[in-house]
Amino acid sequence: MSKDIIQGVWLSGKVHIITNQVVKEQIKPIAAGQTVVADCSHLLVFAAWDTYTAERINKVYDHLTEVRGFTNAGLDNYRQRLLNGYPPRDAEVNFAHAARQAYIAFSMAIVAAAFEGVDATPMEGFDPAALDELLGLREN
């Protein structure tokens, strides 16, 4: 992965911050030719996971405890509840949930950008399969 693509993770997916101009130009036709994709300084792609797995849940919580310095004891009950509830559910139910969570994360980013005085253009119109392939999202 390029150093020009930074990833952040939350329980339901990842945000990819793309600054590489070549990659942004490759995304433009995938985004119905919307020029703002190539013209922006930073393109944020909020990618929802297709389903929840024990591995993904554990990875997020292990990262959370490491970065924030939490003890596992404080999160173990919640983690266990997620592990017992999410992975066994139907993949379509999980994807719909993850997509809604992506919109929540996206909304927070837009609010933060506005607060900081950063111009932001919320948009849809991407070809999901083509974007998945270009950014290697299925492997992540």
Predicted region positions:
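Acidic, surface-exposed loops and disordered segments
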Residues: 1-140
